[in-house]
């Protein structure tokens, strides 16, 4: 199947029919394709990806607030991070067979671009942005609710709650890799107390910057405490990558 073929099948899986299929086409154009075809007067999907990230975050936040009105900001942020991450976006992209529709350069194709998690996740965000531009907010909310149904149906809320069982370090790593393409590092700040009753203070560092600190009776507990604080800081938009 050619990448440009089968768009009707993709629209059927999405449960959405484009009024302007040009927007759908643009969502599938990777920059590598245009680099190798400079004569084409087209745009790649990177700006759509930027918009799609914001649209998806808004939609999931909206649905979680509806679903769990009694949850506090920290709990909602943890749920959103458990849902909106590269792993889950890639899973949905694979279910849509999205990789087969992408327009890639030959080099990207040869290195397995159609199966790359980051590329698939980014392309899904671009696809959601194209739906938003084509049909508006209500249209994209409907598609996102369909695609993320396993998390968002009330009777299936245990799937979302199960995500809360993830340790904070795992959640933080997934979030920072998805948002910043970086992996957090944990550094011992200091130890206090006698050998039989030590308290460890750990810092979580991102790109050379201390993001947060935490304490515990073991290094592992201190790392978890630091990761929890880091998640809260990122959720509150109180940190930026300089």
Swiss-Prot record:
Which PANTHER family is this protein grouped with?
RIBONUCLEASE 3 (PTHR11207:SF0), RIBONUCLEASE III (PTHR11207)
- GO CC, one annotated term: cytoplasm
Q: What is this protein called?
A: Ribonuclease 3
- Identify the domain of life: Bacteria
Q: Where in the cell is it found?
A: Cytoplasm
UniProt xrefs under Gene3D superfamilies: 3.30.160.20, Ribonuclease III domain
- Active site per UniProt: 53, 125
Q: Which gene encodes it?
A: rnc
Q: Is Protein biosynthesis set as a keyword in this record?
A: no
Record function comment: Digests double-stranded RNA. Involved in the processing of primary rRNA transcript to yield the immediate precursors to the large and small rRNAs (23S and 16S). Processes some mRNAs, and tRNAs when they are encoded in the rRNA operon. Processes pre-crRNA and tracrRNA of type II CRISPR loci if present in the organism.
Which family does the record claim for this protein? Belongs to the ribonuclease III family.
Q: Which residue intervals define the domain DRBM in the entry? A: 167-236
One Pfam family in the UniProt entry: Ribonucleas_3_3
Q: Name one GO molecular function term.
A: metal ion binding
Example GO biological process: tRNA processing
State the reactions this protein catalyses. Endonucleolytic cleavage to 5'-phosphomonoester
Q: Which UniProt keywords apply?
A: Cytoplasm, Endonuclease, Hydrolase, Magnesium, Metal-binding, mRNA processing, Nuclease, RNA-binding, rRNA processing, rRNA-binding, tRNA processing
E.C. number: 3.1.26.3
